[in-house]
């Protein structure tokens, strides 16, 4: 149980019409009394002067007091809404910190206290940060769904199903003398398969939510003058990169952040890959390889006027040999406006081949759709929820243990092993909502939040 009181600015730092100071903890009522000079009514907005220790006015604004447990954190909470200048906000915080028992809040500590006081679970707490950081309307809607508990409900449904199945399996183990073989009667196998199917559906939705949050990192790579910078400009819809006929124009990494039907896309244009003698260009090429190694997908640009080949191993075997195996690659035959090739995607080719003209924009829409397909992104965020990498990992581990349990049941009727695998799967699901979490995990999650949240 926390005994100290915390304070922080809840609004973004900098100038603004309104700035909000948030206080949470047992001293919140005392802070209100000392700063406003009166005892505040619960959940009642009052326009009052905010006073310094000597009684002089620091600012004027609205004061709101929320007694526990009916507050965001579940503790006594005070909000002071004053003028949003950084100097005014700083003076108010310094004034509040003169009161005994009050200290500055750590990043995410208000949300952490809300979680610890059962005002929200871990996925809802994380959704607050995701909603603040949302880079598109679709991402904001998904984060709001998580904040409202949609993701949590799906996890709780799975956990409840697991609990009921565990009870049935444990009963079969504890009462082997019963005439009916509960493990062989088909109910356990049927219920287990239903849980596996439901978990698969949640994993697919969670993957969509993770894409919405994290986006896709796409690196445009190839030899100099293949049209990489022109493709960056075509995808971003603006002249982000300088385009000339001079090979080696791009010497450093260029980045653009765009959205394709709500899917965040981090596009990176790199220096043309070749054996360069110029020291600056060499550095740019090495940086290009650094980005390629971290990519979700590489767009391998080929100047269609220089070769008829479509296989990257034939076009540039050294590049393919150096490319990490796990990274997907799409071959882009550029300058189709000059070669008169048919535009669009060739599905029978491995890797995928797309013919386009980065200069005119012809065929670029096919590339956009291809990138969505590569990430399994449906573009339908209605009813979807936001997810993080740790959620995907926990769901995957839960699925793995369920499949092990299913194998033990079907192959060996091993009830004890099945029961243990079900228990571990439930534990991994509980990690998502925070019903089973280490202090280290909580520390990592909340430390990534804004101060004041």
From Swiss-Prot:
GO annotation terms (biological process): tRNA methylation; tRNA wobble uridine modification
Any GO CC annotation of this UniProt entry: cytosol
Cofactor, how bound (note): Binds 1 potassium ion per subunit.
All copies of domain TrmE-type G, residue ranges: 215-376
SUPFAM superfamilies reported in the protein's UniProt record: P-loop containing nucleoside triphosphate hydrolases (SSF52540), TrmE connector domain (SSF116878)
Binding site for GTP: 225-230, 244-250, 269-272, 334-337
Kinase among keywords: no
GO MF terms, alphabetically ordered: GTP binding; GTPase activity; metal ion binding
Residues noted as binding (6S)-5-formyl-5,6,7,8-tetrahydrofolate in the record, renumbered to the chain: 22, 79, 119, 453
Binding-site positions, Mg(2+): 229, 250
CC cofactor: K(+)
Annotated InterPro entries: G_TrmE, GTP-bd, GTP-bd_TrmE_N, GTPase_MnmE, MnmE_dom2, MnmE_helical, P-loop_NTPase, Small_GTP-bd
UniProt EC number: 3.6.-.-
Keyword annotations: Cytoplasm, GTP-binding, Hydrolase, Magnesium, Metal-binding, Nucleotide-binding, Potassium, tRNA processing
Main location: cytoplasm
Binding annotation for K(+): 225, 244, 246, 249
Compartments in which it is found: Cytoplasm
Family to which this protein belongs: Belongs to the TRAFAC class TrmE-Era-EngA-EngB-Septin-like GTPase superfamily. TrmE GTPase family.
Subunit composition and interactions: Homodimer. Heterotetramer of two MnmE and two MnmG subunits.
Cited function: Exhibits a very high intrinsic GTPase hydrolysis rate. Involved in the addition of a carboxymethylaminomethyl (cmnm) group at the wobble position (U34) of certain tRNAs, forming tRNA-cmnm(5)s(2)U34.
Protein name: tRNA modification GTPase MnmE
Protein species of origin: Vibrio vulnificus (strain YJ016)
Gene: mnmE
């Amino acid at each position: 149980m926390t005994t100290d009181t915390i304070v922080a600015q809840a609004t973004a730092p900098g100038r603004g019409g309104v700035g909000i100071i948030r206080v949470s903890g047992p001293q919140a009522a005392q802070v209100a009394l000392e700063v406003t000079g009166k005892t505040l009514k619960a959940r009642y907005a009052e326009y009052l002067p905010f006073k310094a220790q000597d009684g002089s006015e620091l600012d004027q604004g609205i004061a709101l007091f929320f007694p526990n447990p009916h507050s965001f954190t579940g503790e006594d909470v005070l909000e002071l809404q004053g003028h949003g200048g950084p100097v005014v906000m700083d003076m108010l915080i310094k004034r509040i910190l003169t009161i005994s028992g009050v200290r500055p809040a750590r990043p995410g500590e208000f949300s952490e206290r809300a979680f610890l006081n059962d005002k929200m679970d871990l996925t809802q707490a994380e959704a607050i940060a995701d909603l603040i950081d949302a880079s598109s309307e679709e991402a904001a809607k998904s984060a709001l769904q998580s904040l409202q508990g949609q993701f949590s409900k799906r996890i709780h449904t799975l956990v409840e199903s697991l609990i009921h199945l565990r009870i049935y399996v444990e009963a079969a183990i504890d009462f082997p003398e019963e005439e009916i073989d509960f493990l062989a009667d088909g109910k356990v196998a049927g219920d287990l398969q239903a849980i596996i199917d439901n978990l698969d559906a949640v994993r697919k939705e969670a993957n969509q939510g993770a894409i919405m949050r994290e986006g896709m990192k796409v690196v445009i790579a190839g030899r100099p003058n293949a049209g990489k910078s022109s493709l960056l400009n075509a995808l971003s819809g603006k002249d982000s990169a300088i385009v000339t006929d001079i090979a080696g124009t791009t010497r450093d990494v260029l980045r653009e952040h765009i959205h394709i039907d709500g899917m965040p896309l981090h596009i990176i244009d790199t220096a043309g890959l070749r054996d360069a003698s110029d020291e600056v260009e060499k550095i740019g090429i090495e940086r290009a390889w650094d980005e390629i190694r971290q990519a979700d997908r590489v767009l391998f640009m080929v100047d269609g006027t220089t070769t008829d080949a479509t296989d990257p191993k034939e076009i540039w075997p050294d590049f393919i040999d150096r490319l990490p195996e796990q990274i997907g690659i799409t071959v882009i035959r550029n300058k189709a406006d000059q070669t008169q090739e048919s535009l669009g995607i060739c599905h029978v080719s491995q890797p995928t081949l797309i013919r386009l003209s980065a200069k005119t924009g012809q065929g670029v829409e096919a590339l956009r759709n291809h990138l969505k397909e590569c990430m399994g992104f449906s573009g339908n965020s209605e009813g979807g929820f936001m997810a993080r990498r740790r959620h995907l990992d926990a769901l995957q581990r839960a699925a793995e243990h369920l499949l092990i349990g299913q194998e033990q049941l079907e192959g060996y009727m091993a009830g004890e092993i099945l029961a243990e695998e079900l228990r571990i799967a439930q534990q991994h699901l509980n990690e998502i909502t925070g019903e089973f979490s280490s202090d280290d995990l909580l520390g990592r999650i909340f430390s990534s939040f804004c101060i004041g949240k």
